[in-house]
Amino acid sequence: MHESSRLPVGIIGASGYGGVQLVRLLQDHPQLEVAYLGGDRSAGKEFAELYPHLGPHLNLTIEAIDVDRIAERCAAVFLSLPNGLAYDLAPALLERGCKVLDLSADYRFHDLKTYALWYGGDRQDAAVAHTAIYGLPELYRNRIANAQLIGCPGCYPTASLLALAPALKQGLIDPDTIVIDAKSGTSGAGRQAKTNALLAEAGNSVGAYGVARHRHTPEIEQICSDLSGHEVLLQFTPHLMPMVRGIHATIYAKLRDPNLTTEDCLTVYQAFYRNAPMVKVLTHGTYPQTKWAAGTNLCYLGLEVDARTGRIVLLSAIDNLIKGQAGQAIQCLNLMQGWEEGLGLPTLCYYP
């Protein structure tokens, strides 16, 4: 372990967008220090070779993944890997005393049968998976504080669930009427080359993908079911937008009481998130924009009641790489360490 007073952490999967976002954010964290960067195809390369703009701040080489070496040097480890790889590493790291924060889908599900149905894979880690806590601090703050293994939420689920949670928890809506229309920037597809994320394909164009089969659907349904107290099936459709970062979700649901007003619902939301420093509930008539959240760990929420249709319209905006990924993972580690949850996390956007 490091002799530094700061907590040494490692990042496995340091060369992807999630990994580099973690590296950048951790440079500004007063209590955390990057002690290890791990990778597979990038092993042996200087981090500065991959990301020259961060080179002056982090003089580390990406190393081959060695669990014993990681445990010797790190108290906590972020797994920023493709789905299906974390569950081979997390049990060994936990056994060696490391706290583990997994940014993939591997530890997000209560039921591994649901995971297998949507993601595949032969899981042999059911006992370990049972100990994982879903890493959405605004809903599970106390559980996260006492956890050793965190399954960090996906980006679409983060934006969707923060918008839906108060309405579900307080019984404002009929859960079976939920429709989620969400948009994401191209960085959500990762750093590997994909045709639909090329500038010539994504520029000046908007299109849906994963219609009726996107993998984030069961994740959103799982937490909505927990919040409402019964099984929820909902409609979720994501779209790719011609921008680099950001997620915007517009969500529709039928109100149980058609006499509720926008002001009534805003009062519920403001009370629900009164102790949530990373969630900003906007005033009536102001609706979230992705630009406001860019570069921050904030989620902006707005809402409107449509008295004509008896529906509520919920709107949210986050930075998919920060509140939707790396920043939220750090927020969870802050809680696990007993620190203020927003410690070291940005709250001012890039503007314009």
Curated annotation (Swiss-Prot):
EC number of the protein: 1.2.1.38
Chemical reaction(s) catalysed: N-acetyl-L-glutamate 5-semialdehyde + phosphate + NADP(+) = N-acetyl-L-glutamyl 5-phosphate + NADPH + H(+)
Domain of life of the source: Bacteria
PROSITE patterns reported in the protein's UniProt record: ARGC (PS01224)
Associated pathway: Amino-acid biosynthesis; L-arginine biosynthesis; N(2)-acetyl-L-ornithine from L-glutamate: step 3/4
Primary site of residence: cytoplasm
Keywords: Amino-acid biosynthesis, Arginine biosynthesis, Cytoplasm, NADP, Oxidoreductase
SMART domains: Semialdhyde_dh
Biological process, per Gene Ontology: L-arginine biosynthetic process
Family matches, as NCBIfam families: argC
Protein name from the UniProt record: N-acetyl-gamma-glutamyl-phosphate reductase
Residues the record marks as active site: 155
Organism: Synechococcus elongatus (strain ATCC 33912 / PCC 7942 / FACHB-805) (Anacystis nidulans R2)
CDD domains reported for this sequence: AGPR_1_C, AGPR_1_N
SUPFAM superfamilies assigned to the protein according to its UniProt record, in alphabetical order: Glyceraldehyde-3-phosphate dehydrogenase-like, C-terminal domain, NAD(P)-binding Rossmann-fold domains
GO cellular component terms, semicolon-separated: cytoplasm
